[in-house]
Amino acid sequence: MNCEAVVQHLVTWLREKVEEAGARGVVIGVSGGVDSAVAAVLAQKAFPENCMALVLPCESSTEDLIHNRLLLDKFNIPYRVIELDNVYQLLITQLESYIKLDGSKRRLLRANLKPRLRMTTLYYSAQARGYLVLGTTNKSEITVGYSTKHGDSGVDLQILGDLLKREVLELANYLHIPSVIINKTPSGGLWAGQTDEEEMGISYEQLDDYIEYNRGEPGVIERIANL
C-alpha cells in the first residue's frame, strides 16, 4: 500500500466532505486504540486548527487513558476529557430499577450503553462548534457489523471505512503512532478483559484474508457468515 498517497487522499477527502456539509472542522472520540489514533492524526492533518479530540472515560482502563495522552501530546492534538462514569452509573441504576437482567445479557446491555453515551457527547460538542463527528470504525468491522448501533457507528463520516484492519496498522506505522498503541490487543473496552477477536471468534488476520481474498477455513467462513 502506498501510505503517502492514502494519507493524502484521506486528508483531501475529509476536507471536501466537511466543506460540502458547511461545517468548520471535526470532533473525534479517542479510545487509546490504534483505529482512533490513526483517525485522529488524519483529522489533525486535515484541520490543524479545527480538530477536537474528546477523551470520554467510562469505566475505562488506566492503560487506555495513558495511551490517549501519549498520542495527543505527541501530535499536539487539542483535546478535552469528559468523565462519563457518573452519568453511566446513574443511568444503569435507573434502568435496572425496573428491568431485571442477569448474566451475559446484562453485561452486553451495559457495554453498549457506553458508546451510546459517547455518541451523545460527541454530537453535543460537534454541534456547539459547527463541526462534524468523525468515526473510527475500519472496513473489517463494518463488513461484519462489529459496532454498536447508534454508538460508535453513529457518526457523520467514517474516515477508515475503506481500510482493512491490517491497512490501518500499516498506516499507523507510517504515521509513527506510538508502538505501544500499535501493538496492543484490539479491544473496544466494553468490559474488563474484553477483546475484539475473542468476541468475534476469529482473528483480524482471518477476517481480512476473507474480505480481501475471499478465502479461509470452512469454520472461519461460517463464523464470519454468522456475525
Role assignments for model-derived ranges:
Residues 89, 93, 148, 170-173, ...:
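Generic alpha-helical structural context detector
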Residues 206-215:
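Short alpha-helical "packing" element that flanks the helix-turn-helix/winged-helix DNA-binding module
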Residues 216-227:
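Intrinsic disorder and flexible/low-complexity segments
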Residues 73, 110-114, 118, 132-205:
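Catalytic subdomain that performs nucleotidyl-dependent activation
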Residues 1-144:
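ATP-dependent adenylation/nucleotidyltransferase module used to activate substrates
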